[in-house]
Regions:
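Soluble secreted/lumenal catalytic domains
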Residues: 1-166, 170-199
Length: 199
C-alpha cells in the first residue's frame, strides 16, 4: 500500500556542509524537508521509491535500480565525511518491473553509487529511518503519455502491495526562465514554476 508521497526539490546546497552560504535562502525549503521527514517517519514505510530525472544513461527507458546496497558521497563538493548508505529491495524491484514490462519501457539495472542529487535528499528525508530500503528510479526520455502510463501502473502496483511504500519524486523548477540560461528560454517556464510552487 502507498503510505506517503511527496514532490521535493533536489540540490546539493540543501546539505549544511555544502550550502552554508545559501542557508538563509533555503530556510523555508529546509523547514519543509524537516516536516516531510517527520511525516515520512510517522508513515513507517518498508520501502521508499525515489524517482529522479537524473540519468546515468540517456535512454527512452525507465530504469529501476535493484542494487542490494546503495552508497552516496559528496566529495566533489568538498565534504569528505558525508556517507549515505541504505539497503535496496531487490525482490520488490524485480516484481515491480515484471508488472510493468507489458505496458511501459522499463529495465532493471544495478548502480550502487548514487548521484548527490539523489543521495542528499534521501539522506535528509530518511535520517530517522536508517533501516528503510530504497529503490531509485530514473525517468525516461519519452512522451508525456508514456510517463502517465508508467505512473498509473506504478500506482496500481504499489496500492496492491503488502509492503508499506513511500514515493518521493525529486525535481527542480524550470531552468529556462532567462534568454541567458544554458538550457535556453521558454515562455512556458514561468507558468510551470508557478504551477509547481502552488501544489
Amino acid at each position: 500500500m502507498i503510505v506517503f508521497s511527496a514532490l521535493v526539490p533536489s540540490s546539493p546546497f540543501l546539505f549544511p556542509s555544502i550550502g552554508q552560504s545559501a542557508t538563509d535562502k533555503l530556510k523555508a525549503t529546509l523547514q519543509a524537508y524537516q516536516e516531510l521527514s517527520a511525516h515520512l517517519y510517522a508513515a513507517q514505510p518498508d520501502i521508499i521509491v525515489v524517482v529522479s530525472s537524473y540519468k546515468t544513461v540517456e535512454a527512452s527507458t525507465f530504469f529501476i535500480n535493484q542494487s542490494p546496497h546503495y552508497t552516496g558521497h559528496v566529495k566533489e563538493f568538498g565534504d569528505l565525511e558525508f556517507s549515505f548508505r541504505r539497503k535496496g529491495a531487490i525482490g520488490f524491484a524485480h516484481h515491480w518491473k515484471e508488472s510493468l514490462a507489458r505496458t511501459s519501457p522499463v529495465q532493471l539495472h544495478t548502480k550502487q553509487d548514487l548521484h548527490p542529487t539523489i543521495s542528499i535528499p534521501a539522506e535528509i528525508l530518511t535520517k530517522p529511518l536508517p533501516r528503510v530500503k530504497i529503490i531509485p528510479v530514473e525517468v525516461a526520455d519519452v512522451s508525456s503519455d508514456l510517463h502517465y502510463q508508467f505512473g498509473k501502473e506504478k500506482n496500481n502496483a504499489f496500492a496492491s502491495a503488502q509492503q508499506r511504500v513511500a514515493v518521493c519524486v525529486l525535481g527542480t523548477l524550470s531552468q529556462k526562465l532567462s534568454p541567458d540560461s544554458p538550457a535556453g528560454f521558454s515562455l512556458a517556464a514561468k507558468t510551470y514554476d508557478t504551477f509547481m510552487m502552488s501544489h
